Amino acid sequence: KINKNIIKKYGAVSHECCKAMVRNLSKISKSKINISITGIAGPGGATKNKPVGLVYIGIKKGKTLLIKENRFKSNNRNSIQKSIVREVIKIVFNLI
């Protein structure tokens, strides 16, 4: 669960929300690596400040916490989703 105030203040697609997601997941999961993703893959949902392709990836491994903002340049939902998966794999690979 994410504190409603975080979503009200920053939005569901935000650094702060992604961080809260991965931190909370690490509290309830027995996994050594936890991952959260929030973003706008399109085709709808974009705003001037949060365009299609804006994605936050959160990864927590032990005490290491990484939140990465990405701006994928495609307007194709499937392409953005594939790019997210590639980016997550790359980050996790570098952490292990």
Model regions: which residues?
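Short alpha-helical segments enriched in small residues
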Residues: 1-96
